[in-house]
Amino acid sequence: TYGSQLALGALGITIVYTVLRFSNFAHGEFMSFGTMSTILLTWVFIDSNIKLGTMPTAIVVLPISIMLTIIYCLLVDKFVFKFYRQQKSKSVIALIVSIGVMFFTGGLIRFIIGPGDKNFMDGERFILKAKDFKMLTGLDEGLTIKSTQGVTIILTIILVILLFWFLNKTKTGKSMRAYSDNQELALLSGINPERIVLITWIITGTLACVAGTLYGLDKSYKPFTYLHLVLPIFAAAIVGGVGNPIGAIIGGFVISFSELLITFAYKKFFFYILPDNF
């Protein structure tokens, strides 16, 4: 599931880099903003006793928090990035500006919701419990599947399929690809650049909100965590090939396995096979 979350985050960074030509270091805070919106709405829905059975209430409010995240991304573009785009500033300038946006957004989030841990998971935590798995299979070892893991995998598959269908099959998606390949030629072909920018931020805001919310549900929400999450997300985008959406997805899983499998799983393995005085 961590790989799915990194993949969605890396896709958001890749879309901005490919179309708008800069590395958006504020993407982690956009994810945090989307998660914060989900948390606040979840608390409201829980107080109103609006739930979705065994699934987390956060899934119910996710469409609303996606809209709020998109609006925030569009406001940031309108009042910050648009100026530098009109000035035809170099990519490195936009990158530095995105770092400023990152710190501003992080401060805004901590001002609204505070810097501490926020747990917004409710509903049934497990789709399959270890003892139920043992009873079904007769095996000695148990297997546990959390509801957040199931939701993460399903939403990731749906979003990836929809994104690639949009980019490859729709007129707007093809216009975005043409604009990213050659902006001057795309403008001569009658493509509206402002519309392309609008759609880009809509996609970015959606991916950021979903990825951030799924990460917060699976672990817990703490604003500073998303600041640090930028590094593995960028690593995933780079490993998969900068500007390559498919590579971003693969990179997300490569980085997640590198972090979780190599960093943690093999510690116990080497602890048992190496001499005590090693």
Residue ranges and their predicted role:
Residues 49-101, 250-255, 259:
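Alpha-helical transmembrane segments within multi-pass membrane transporters and channels
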Residues 57-63, 198-208, 212-278:
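Transmembrane alpha-helical segments in multi-pass inner-membrane proteins
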Residues 83, 92-169, 264-278:
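Transmembrane helix-bundle core of multi-pass membrane transporters
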Residues 1-9, 37, 48-60, 87-92, ...:
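Membrane-interfacial amphipathic/re-entrant helices at transmembrane-helix boundaries
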Residues 2, 142-221, 226, 248-250:
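Helix-loop-helix "hairpin" substructures at the membrane interface of multi-pass membrane proteins
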Residues 19-23, 27-75, 142, 270-271:
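Membrane-embedded helix boundary and interhelical linker motif in transport proteins
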Residues 1-41, 79-89, 93, 237-245:
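Single transmembrane alpha-helix segments in multi-pass membrane proteins
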Residues 35-40, 65-72, 99-109, 155-164, ...:
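Hydrophobic core segments of alpha-helical transmembrane domains in multi-pass membrane transport
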